[in-house]
């Protein structure tokens, strides 16, 4: 197989989300969350998620049943559920399971990939032009260009992400982590709001917010209890790419 053969990205379809949120949360790791704007593409690799299981999950917004606020989570799979929390930021979720059955996945952290300067600006973070560290490999196929390098054995890439080799790299990673490490941060970086995005299809080719698979291979996944919640806090429903520096919060043991 040609090692420079393009890796084709594919838009995730509704069937991907039409299953148990735990399976979806794990499978989303390594995929790209993409926002199309008039000023260009914003994209981040999904590195951390949490599953919410519906009416049997005390921490889920659907635990007490269907309301006008949470109705998206009872609808078809693959739709954005956005809520406002703590009076200062939005959180993005995607609906799972068949229409009428509640369930969803929260996006907790992204590794910035494309449009980093624009995302930083949206977050109020100043990054000098030309000083942004580039990923060792950017999933350009997912953004409308040809990707390079594929695995001769599988056709899937397994790059761990940003290469950290010097102290200066650690400082840059620390700065970039402020862009989209955490559910509120990633929503602000991708300009996600409830008014703009709640109820939006993430599986439509016409949507300006979508999730694509660019054949990135996740090597190892860590599973822990969810964080930042009081109810059902010990259930192991948080998933993240092991060793990725953009994961938010501390890693509690399952």
Region spans (language model):
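Conserved, well-structured core segments that form or line functional sites
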Residues: 2-143, 147, 164-254
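N-terminal polybasic/positive-inside topogenic patches
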Residues: 152-153, 160-161, 165-168
């Amino acid at each position: 197989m040609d090692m420079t053969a393009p890796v084709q990205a594919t838009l995730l379809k509704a069937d991907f989300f039409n299953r148990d949120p735990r399976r979806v949360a794990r499978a989303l790791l390594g995929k790209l969350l993409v926002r199309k704007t008039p000023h260009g593409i914003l994209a981040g690799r999904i590195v951390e998620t949490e599953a919410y299981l519906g009416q049997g999950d005390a921490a889920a917004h659907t635990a007490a049943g269907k309301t006008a606020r949470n109705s998206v989570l009872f609808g078809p799979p693959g739709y954005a559920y956005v809520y406002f929390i703590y009076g200062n930021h939005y959180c993005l979720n995607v609906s799972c399971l068949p229409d009428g059955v509640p369930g969803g996945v929260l996006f907790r952290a992204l590794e910035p990939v494309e449009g980093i300067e624009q995302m930083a600006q949206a977050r109020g973070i100043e990054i000098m032009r030309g000083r942004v560290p580039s990923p060792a490999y950017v999933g350009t196929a997912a953004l409308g260009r040809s990707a390079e390098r594929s695995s001769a054995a599988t056709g899937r890439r397994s790059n761990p992400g940003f290469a950290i080799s010097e102290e200066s790299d650690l400082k840059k990673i620390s700065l970039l982590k402020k862009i989209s490490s955490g559910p509120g941060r990633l929503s602000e970086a991708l300009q996600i709001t409830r008014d703009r995005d709640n109820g939006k299809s993430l599986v439509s080719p016409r949507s300006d917010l979508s999730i694509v698979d660019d054949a990135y291979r996740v090597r190892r996944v860590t599973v822990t209890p969810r964080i930042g919640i009081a109810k059902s806090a010990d259930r192991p429903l948080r998933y993240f790419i092991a060793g990725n520096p953009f994961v938010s919060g501390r890693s509690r043991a399952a």
